[in-house]
């Protein structure tokens, strides 16, 4: 059984998928901010474009949708498991991933603050939703689960680090809680890799990317 801390008392966000991209509205207010994934996704990614060109649009779409489906189911399992629910059955194609992720959860999560955590920053004018705020070996941390078709290199996931840095900053702004580390357990058919970083190392780059987004897309935010 996982220990759960008292609720963080965060405001709820309403997700809206617009033609211009995803935004979050702060329930009970007039505030609407672009999602952090939208902000970071605005920068061109030549390696993805090259991959899509190499395999073809149809195959790229098939691979992406299959990976997204597995990722959603794996995340749902983790959420239920950390919520101390019984997992009656696990689909075979997800079980091969779950058998890698579950031991890591058991070994390192020592307390749960919140799951599916709605976060926004008035200072940065961005919003988002992270998977988990938890104690990792006793250290308050942001945790965002990822699924991949094959193992990743740190150089491939720099935007994940910026995403996690935003979550840590927004959590501090909303609650005063400091998470000095962000973890990304990335599970593939070959195992679970856990990438760890410190938000302080990515603050300047995150600000630059947000400023770049607003300079280019301010009129299309909402």
What feature does the model see in each segment?
Residues 116-220:
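Mg2+/Mn2+-dependent nuclease catalytic core
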Residues 91, 221-222:
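Short, flexible loop/turn segments with low-complexity composition
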Residues 1-127:
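Metal-dependent nuclease catalytic cores that hydrolyze phosphodiester bonds in DNA/RNA
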């Amino acid at each position: 059984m996982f220990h759960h801390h008292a609720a963080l008392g965060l405001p709820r966000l309403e997700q809206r998928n617009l033609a211009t991209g995803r935004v979050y509205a702060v329930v009970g207010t007039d505030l609407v901010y672009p999602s952090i994934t939208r902000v970071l996704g605005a920068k061109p990614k030549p390696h993805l474009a090259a991959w899509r060109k190499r395999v073809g649009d149809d195959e790229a779409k098939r691979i992406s949708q299959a990976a997204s489906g597995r990722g959603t189911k794996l995340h749902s399992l983790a959420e239920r498991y950390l919520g101390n629910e019984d997992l009656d059955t696990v689909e075979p194609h997800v079980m091969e991933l779950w058998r890698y992720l579950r031991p890591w959860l058991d070994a390192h999560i020592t307390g749960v603050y919140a799951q599916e955590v709605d976060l926004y920053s008035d200072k940065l004018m961005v919003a988002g939703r992270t998977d988990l705020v938890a104690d990792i070996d006793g250290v308050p941390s942001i945790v965002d689960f990822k699924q991949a078709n094959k193992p990743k290199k740190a150089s491939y996931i720099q935007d994940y680090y910026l995403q996690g840095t935003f979550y840590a900053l927004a959590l501090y702004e909303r609650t005063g809680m400091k998470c000095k580390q962000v973890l990304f357990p990335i599970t593939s058919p070959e195992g679970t890799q856990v990438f760890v970083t410190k938000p302080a190392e990515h603050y300047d780059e995150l600000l630059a990317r947000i400023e770049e987004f607003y300079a280019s897309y301010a009129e299309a935010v909402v």
